[in-house]
Amino acid sequence: MATPPKRFCPSPSTSSEGTRIKKISIEGNIAAGKSTFVNILKQASEDWEVVPEPVARWCNVQSTQEEFEELTTSQKSGGNVLQMMYEKPERWSFTFQSYACLSRIRAQLASLNGKLKDAEKPVLFFERSVYSDRYIFASNLYESDCMNETEWTIYQDWHDWMNSQFGQSLELDGIIYLRATPEKCLNRIYLRGRNEEQGIPLEYLEKLHYKHESWLLHRTLKTSFDYLQEVPVLTLDVNEDFKDKHESLVEKVKEFLSTL
């Protein structure tokens, strides 16, 4: 296994102004409101940038933000690995989780060389992290018998190695936890109408909610990355629609950032 950091020591990524780029992960259940939230943050400051989840790559659909990018080999094959995972989780969970993490690492690393290089007080917001990939979603699939013992062992070994190679550049300064009930998330799944997600049962969301609570609220979830225990967490209750509460949310985020 990769040797985890022994203390909280974020990576030294800096802007051209000489200011270290703060890296914040936005975490939460499926349909908690992460995409809406990161769009609010993106518009709040020129010194802030967001890295959305690469859902388009998982679905073989180029989003408007990524029209300039060439299709990867896996996209050209025409596979919707997200839909495949939901339809046959025992067959495709290992494949999906491996590719989800790989595409996330690629997107987040690429963002470090983006517009924030010229920012005065740069902050980079990730929509989820490599840690929730493993300790929330992949582990839940393993515990639900959608990954067998061999697949889970290989996934953990692969995840450890990937983080030993690239993880220092992606280490977090803080986490924002968008907290919503599983019932509210299920309702939002129906409302946003993403075809691949329409068969998700409440029980699945409840399991993910429990893991998020253990990790970010109670801080009892154990990981291989010691420094995560010291990363500050801002918890925001998002059960209510927050589309009309932009200013309040942004102020809470600014206050949180000032403490980091």
Swiss-Prot record:
Arranged from A to Z, the UniProt key words for this protein are: ATP-binding, Kinase, Nucleotide-binding, Nucleus, Phosphoprotein, Transferase
Its domain of life?
Eukaryota
Question: Which GO BP terms apply?
Answer: dAMP salvage; dGMP salvage; pyrimidine nucleotide metabolic process
The chemistry this enzyme catalyses reads: 2'-deoxycytidine + a ribonucleoside 5'-triphosphate = dCMP + a ribonucleoside 5'-diphosphate + H(+); 2'-deoxyadenosine + ATP = dAMP + ADP + H(+); 2'-deoxyguanosine + ATP = dGMP + ADP + H(+)
SUPFAM superfamilies (UniProt xref): P-loop containing nucleoside triphosphate hydrolases
* Active site (catalytic residues): E127
Q: How is it modified after translation?
A: Phosphorylated and activated in vitro upon phosphorylation at Ser-74 by CSNK1D/CK1.
**The keyword Transferase appears for this protein:** yes
Where is ATP bound in this sequence? 28-36, 188-192, 240-242
Q: How does it assemble?
A: Homodimer.
Q: What is this protein called?
A: Deoxycytidine kinase
Q: Which organism is it from?
A: Mus musculus (Mouse)
Task: Name the gene that codes for it.
Answer: Dck
